[in-house]
């Protein structure tokens, strides 16, 4: 649960150039996961 709350915290903060590497990795990871999930949903709907 801690990871989810951290991600929510990072996503609610305005983006800064000095954002920590962990924040960026979590943000990028979140986007990748969202894209994969979206593709799975689309595929499920089409079938």
UniProtKB/Swiss-Prot annotation:
What GO CC annotations are associated with the protein?
membrane; viral inner membrane; virion membrane
Q: How does it sit in the membrane?
A: Single-pass membrane protein
**Which coarse location class describes where this protein primarily resides?**
virion
User: Where are the bilayer-spanning segments?
Assistant: 22-42
Instruction: Name the keywords, alphabetized.
Output: Capsid inner membrane protein, Membrane, Transmembrane, Transmembrane helix, Viral genome packaging, Viral release from host cell, Virion
Instruction: State its location(s).
Output: Virion membrane
Summary of subunit composition and partner proteins: Heterodimer of P20 and P22; further multimerizes as hexamers of heterodimers. Part of the dodecameric portal complex that is composed of the packaging efficiency factor P6, the DNA packaging ATPase P9, and the internal heterododecamer P20/P22 which spans the virion inner membrane.
Q: Explain the purpose of this protein.
A: Together with P22, forms the internal part of the portal complex embeded in the virion internal membrane and which plays critical roles in genome packaging and genome ejection. Both proteins multimerize as a single ring-shaped heterdodecamer arranged around a central channel and interact with the P6/P9 external part of the portal.
Name under which the protein is recorded = Packaging protein P22
Naturally occurring in which organism (per UniProt): Enterobacteria phage PRD1
């Amino acid at each position: 649960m801690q990871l989810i709350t951290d991600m929510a915290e990072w996503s609610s903060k305005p983006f800064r150039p000095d954002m920590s590497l962990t924040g960026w990795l979590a943000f990028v990871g979140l986007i990748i996961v969202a894209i994969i999930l979206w593709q799975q949903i689309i595929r499920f709907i089409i079938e």
